[in-house]
Amino acid sequence: MRSTLAIDLTCLALGPLSWTPRGIDRVELAYAWHFLNHWPGECVVVIPTLWGMRYFDRSRAVRGLLALEEIWREKISPEDDASYSRMKSFILTHSAASWSAFAPRAKPTWQQARDFFRLLRGTGLAFGKSVGSLPKDAIYLNVGQLLFLRPFISWLARRPDILSVFMIHDLLPLEYPDHHVSLGIRLDRSIVRNTAELARALIVPSHAVRTSLQQSFLPPRLATLPTHVELLPVSPAFLQPAKKDPELSHAEYFIACGAIDAHKNHILLLEVWKELVARHGDRTPKLVIAGFRSVTSKPIFDFIADHPAIHKKVIISSGLSTPALRRLIMSAKALLMPSIAEGFGLPIIEALAQGVPVLASDIPAMREAGAGGNVTYLPATDATEWRSAIEAFGKNPHGQGEVSQYVPKQWSDYFLGIEAFLTELQANQLQKHQ
């Protein structure tokens, strides 16, 4: 008999704060839908409330997920997305754009409040049950990595019978402090400390992250916890039947996706585009950067503001619905991902699943994400090599790599590995209690 599975959906509960889902949100959403639909035992969701951490039943959770997908516009047509229309207009026209008009902005407080109300209306008002009353030997699964929020997980210290399994997506602020602000470093230290104290097992998205957990500056217990490595699949939203936008089929543009963080190395791309404009003028392809603003974004926006010559060729936007983002990726010449470091690299597999080639940094996590796909790996700090590779697309539409028949990993296969890991952990726990 399977134990009760309590899946923490704190990231999704906070979803109305943002325009669209982040990569981690997509992972948590996939976990939620899978286990709510397929876990053979009882499955409940854990979220923060005004009354503390509470858990709720399947039916209420499903209503909440449906409401959140509507808030995030996960099912709309790209043609109904105003952000997509603006981006397409920029790509297809030759006039100078007011790039600042596209710049990512925080969601206004009134819209956040409105969308929280929409989420509450979707689920219905309920008090739920205290996490302290979860059934004995339940499995607690947390994949959102909001583990620095100690009050949200401190209850685990009072329930040693609970099998707590955390997903660690990366520890980049600790590994690359020069590319992160002090707050991010402090939060990651809290994540490490809380994980070492409260986790009973770990899930990681790459062998690169598994290696990171073994570094000497981390608590020794992290390296001894049972750890399952399972490479992430493409979000289901990127696998639905879809067609390219015919108006973009001959457009010359590249795309970079993900949070606008210092470690993503967008500065290199801007340096490359400045050089491309100097060399090729109006024949320079356009660069679309689709992502959220972060606390380390300022140098990116300052660079663009200080170099008017690239205003016709570079645009930054956030708030694109997932269908719209996918449509933009589908017609791009290539996806660009020059990150200094990553825990995995979701945009790589999202692009490969659309048949779009990738230029990526030659780092372990990128190699894992791009295995079997048309990926050209380049030094993360060599702007000249990146410029040459981008220019090569003007001569060869497939870039420097060979055309491959990339087969995306399926979530069903992914969860076979995850469920086998949870089953083994559960069996070991029950054996210890006998």
Where are the regions that the model predicts?
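Carbohydrate transferase catalytic cores enriched for Leloir-type hexosyltransferases
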Residues: 1-434
